[in-house]
Amino acid sequence: MTMDALSRLVEALRCLPGVGPKSAQRMVFHLLQHQRQRGLHLASCLEQAMKHISHCQQCNNYTEQTLCALCQNPNRDSTLLCVVESPADVSAIEQSNSFQGKYFVLMGKISPLDGLGPDDIGLPKLKELITREKIQEVILALSPSVESQTTIHFIHQLLKDETVNISQLAHGIPSGGELEFLDGNTISSALKNRAVINV
């Protein structure tokens, strides 16, 4: 059975997190009934983003250039590196206005059940960056979970021969909580009260 344009759009919107069939249908009907021009603008912006946004060659954050704006910024503290799971976490920390160093985005956590090992999340690239840029402190800003603890352990082992301090965010971030959904004050407090890791 072939789908018509309306059904295809409803089905396409369901790929977004938290959007079920009813929500997707409401969005489509709203755009068709009240916001056709904005719907066309949305489609155009989405197409441009999908075509032109890729990953920064140094930190893996999203960018339209070879290096993202944060990596290019000479005013950032290049001796301080914050390691996060996703570009959404970079955005959350930046909104807290509590960190002036550089970032490295892992694009996930080590998870054998999902087939993700150290190489899949870019740990060799992380080590290379730390050595090349002479990083003095690595802050592990990972959401609390079993996979995060596994990832932290692997990073610590990877860097054991490097002359670099390794710390992680202080408690206050709820277990199982996602960094991108926390308010700026919580993130700021966790960064300021980060703890040195002893594995």
From Swiss-Prot:
The protein's name: Recombination protein RecR
Similarity section: Belongs to the RecR family.
Signal peptide per UniProt: none
Alphabetized NCBIfam families for the sequence: recR
This protein's UniProt keywords: DNA damage, DNA recombination, DNA repair, Metal-binding, Zinc, Zinc-finger
Any GO MF annotation of the entry: zinc ion binding
Pfam families found in the cross-reference section: RecR_C (PF21175), RecR_HhH (PF21176), RecR_ZnF (PF02132), Toprim_4 (PF13662)
Domain Toprim: start-end pairs: 79-174
Keyword DNA repair attached: yes
Lineage: Bacteria, Pseudomonadati, Pseudomonadota, Gammaproteobacteria, Legionellales
Transmembrane segment boundaries: none
An example Gene Ontology biological process: DNA recombination
SUPFAM superfamilies on file: Recombination protein RecR (SSF111304)
Function summary: May play a role in DNA repair. It seems to be involved in an RecBC-independent recombinational process of DNA repair. It may act with RecF and RecO.
Organism from which the protein derives: Legionella pneumophila subsp. pneumophila (strain Philadelphia 1 / ATCC 33152 / DSM 7513)
Residue intervals of every C4-type zinc finger in the record: 56-71
InterPro entries, sorted: DNA_Rcmb_RecR (IPR000093), Rcmb_RecR (IPR023627), Rcmb_RecR_Znf (IPR015967), TOPRIM_dom (IPR006171), TOPRIM_RecR (IPR034137)
